[in-house]
A protein has these predicted regions:
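Substrate-binding/active-site clefts of carbohydrate-active enzymes
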Residues: 145, 151-198, 205-357, 362, ...
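Carbohydrate-interacting/catalytic domains
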Residues: 1-147, 151, 157, 170-198, ...
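Hydrophobic faces of well-ordered beta-strands that scaffold small-molecule active sites
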Residues: 146-148, 200-202, 246-248, 368, ...
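Short glycine/proline- and charge-enriched loop/turn segments
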Residues: 169, 214-222, 334-336, 420-425, ...
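Active-site clefts of carbohydrate-active enzymes
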Residues: 453-477
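Short, solvent-exposed loop/turn segments at secondary-structure junctions
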Residues: 153-156, 206-207, 252-253, 366, ...
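Active-site-proximal helices and loops of the catalytic beta/alpha 8
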Residues: 236, 240-244, 254, 262-273, ...
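Glycine-rich, histidine-containing beta strand-loop boundary motifs that form or position
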Residues: 63, 103, 159, 203-204, ...
């Protein structure tokens, strides 16, 4: 809801014209080009956020249009030891409107922020103009959606087992298959629906010689081992009948050497029509191998013959400086079987854009998760969004960008990111316990402020994936730690990301350990984490505030985290207790109803059970 303009001394900037002075000790942050700081609502009103040092006690958005001036008070939405985060939703404003910020220092003096910086006075022309209101069109259905990620070769198998496959449930291998397929996924859709899944995210399904399939041979063919194209069509149709959406995983940065264009380059060299689709440093193609530079995990005696066979190029042993293996063409992280595609080449770019549109248009998928987005030419993603959205305006576009993904989430590229920062936060507080609750709340608040509100609601908040160790393994096998992380995941703003098998308490180290086969026979829906997820997804459906509500951290003790989710007049308190003892929290308000969890509320005092969580309606 937009704020009302208020008469206030800070809003009367007639009195502060003069010679500006630099108040450099005040750290105030606002970037009008970052949607995390300035975004627009559907009615054209502006959502404005500013970060300040905690000592500033009051903040106001000062909007001037012609002779009129309005002051809109910003409210504190989160605090850390380093920053206070202020926010206001105000407007819509006239096209002529210009704005600055005013703050009150502890000594009651005014502090001002304008395009020229932090100052003690405002110059008449030193103001920002509001850009034309434009919505960051994140699909509504993706906001708060429960996303279930699965590794197709290891999730479920349908029919008789091929004798060339490893036995189902055998120790996971980087090179061998266990026979999971898309028909097997269809057979488990009712299970996923019962769990509360809204979106099914599949690791790559296109034809490839590897079980991870990030080295694609044919982008127009679903791997026959998975059942082929019609198996995907059937999966999409059956999932949609259960109101589950499907997003595919695309790796357009690199291909397998058997990809038609690279194969032509390998055979014809500079005469190939596809020569500029790749970045070849030397011709003829070859591999330089430096045995004395190899790490212990890289067994060159095993891998070099494999690479020579797959790529069809010779290798030579050298003893100079350089990486252990160096192809004479650019490849993803130097892996010879993943030559990089030159997406600045118009034809290569056009090919990949056609692929992106094809699966949305012809097979009805609901979006894409794009691999290693950081390493692709940034403007490719502008074209990618335009092409996919032309086919399906509400397609969900998810990027894999480790760390701060802000540059990819300004409304012109992706809708959301795989939120590995969220995972790191959960690992440090819940799995290993090496940070205290106040540090956890600081980082959660910083994460909340990092992106625009639509992006925050759509970010995939994962605690595990195919590229990480499983959370239970990170937690030393202590299931209560996974339980607490799941409670936080299901109550913090965003789209909770479940990695297949975590609901069954699967363990496993990093790749390939985290890619084991689902054990459908010895586990079932009575497993504690499975039941927890079912309960919380059901609660999310009943309580829109847990999905769309504003977030604010309220308190942190050594092991107790308390925050609220508020949507209009509905306010929920979430309490998570990491301690082995019961915890108490004195809440404001006269009424407290326990909606879920272990504990109770009496006379404003809320008690949370040991190593458990609680959701309270206030």
């Amino acid at each position: 809801m937009a704020s009302r303009a208020e008469p206030h001394p800070l809003a009367d900037d007639h009195g502060v014209y003069g010679m500006p002075g630099d108040l450099s000790p005040w750290d105030i942050r606002f970037d009008p080009e970052d949607r995390a700081h300035l975004d627009f609502e559907s009615d054209g009103s502006a959502r404005v956020r500013v970060w300040t040092e905690p000592e500033l006690v009051e903040a106001m958005l000062v909007v001037r249009s012609g002779r009129s001036v309005e002051g809109h008070a910003l409210r504190v939405v989160a605090r850390t030891a380093r920053f206070t985060f202020w926010e206001v939703v105000a407007g819509p404003f006239q096209e002529s409107a210009r704005f600055t910020f005013a703050f009150r220092a502890p000594n009651a003096e005014g502090v001002y922020l304008a395009p020229s910086g932090v100052t003690n006075a405002i110059e008449r022309l030193d103001r920002w103009a509001f850009p034309a209101p434009s919505l960051h069109s994140v699909p509504e259905w993706s906001k708060g959606a429960v996303i279930y990620q699965l590794f197709p070769d290891r999730f479920a198998r349908h029919g008789a087992m091929d004798t060339d496959l490893d036995p189902w449930g055998s120790p996971p291998s980087s090179t061998r298959f266990q026979g999971g397929d898309l028909a097997g996924v269809v057979g488990r859709l009712d299970y996923l629906s019962d769990l509360g899944v809204d979106v099914l995210y599949l690791n790559p399904v296109f034809t490839s010689p590897s079980n991870h399939r990030y080295d694609t041979i044919d982008y127009h063919e679903v791997d026959p081992l998975l059942g082929g194209n019609e198996a995907l069509r059937n999966l999409v149709d059956e999932a949609h009948r259960r109101s589950i959406r499907i997003i595919l995983d695309g790796s357009f940065n690199h291909v397998h050497p058997e990809f038609f264009a690279f194969r032509d380059v390998a055979g014809r060299g500079p005469a190939s029509a596809y020569w500029d689709w790749f970045l070849v440093d030397e011709w003829p193609l070859r591999l330089r191998v430096r045995p004395d530079r190899a790490h212990s995990f890289l067994d060159l005696a095993v891998w070099v013959p494999v690479w020579e066979s797959e790529i069809g190029v010779p290798s030579e042993v050298v003893h100079d400086d350089g990486p252990a293996v160096e192809p004479s063409y650019q490849a993803w992280y130097g892996v010879p079987t993943m030559p990089r595609v030159n997406l600045t080449n118009p034809d290569a770019r056009g090919y990949m854009l056609d692929v992106a549109a094809h699966w949305v248009r012809e097979y009805g998928i609901d979006g894409w998760r794009m691999d290693v987005a950081r390493y692709v030419d940034p403007d490719f993603w502008d074209d990618f969004r335009r092409v996919v959205r032309a086919v399906r305006p509400d397609a969900y576009l998810l990027c894999e960008v480790m760390g701060d993904a802000s540059d990819w989430l300004q409304g012109n590229r992706f809708d959301a990111t795989m939120n590995y920062t969220f995972r790191d936060l959960c690992v440090h507080f819940f799995a290993t316990g090496d940070i205290a609750a106040d540090v956890f709340c600081d980082r959660a608040a910083r994460l909340w402020a990092q992106y625009s509100w639509p992006v925050t609601l759509a970010n995939q908040n994962l605690i595990g994936s195919h590229d990480t160790a499983r959370f239970l393994t990170e937690a030393g096998g202590e299931e209560w730690r996974l339980r607490l992380a799941t409670i936080f995941q299901m109550t913090y703003p965003g789209a909770p990301g479940i990695y297949y098998g975590d609901e069954m308490g699967m363990s496993g180290g990093e790749d390939p350990g985290s890619r084991g086969a689902m054990d459908w026979e010895s586990t079932g829906p009575d497993h504690g984490i499975h039941s927890l997820i079912r309960e919380l997804t059901e609660l999310r459906r009943k309580e829109p505030a847990l999905v769309m509500g504003d977030w604010r951290a309220l308190s942190s003790q050594a092991n107790l985290v308390v925050f609220e989710r508020r949507l209009i007049d509905r306010c929920l308190l979430v309490l998570i207790n990491r301690s082995s003892a019961r915890a108490r929290y004195e809440a404001s308000g006269a009424s407290h109803e326990v909606l879920w969890g272990e504990g109770g509320a009496e006379n404003g005092v809320i008690t949370v059970g040991p190593r458990s969580g609680l959701v309270i309606a206030q």
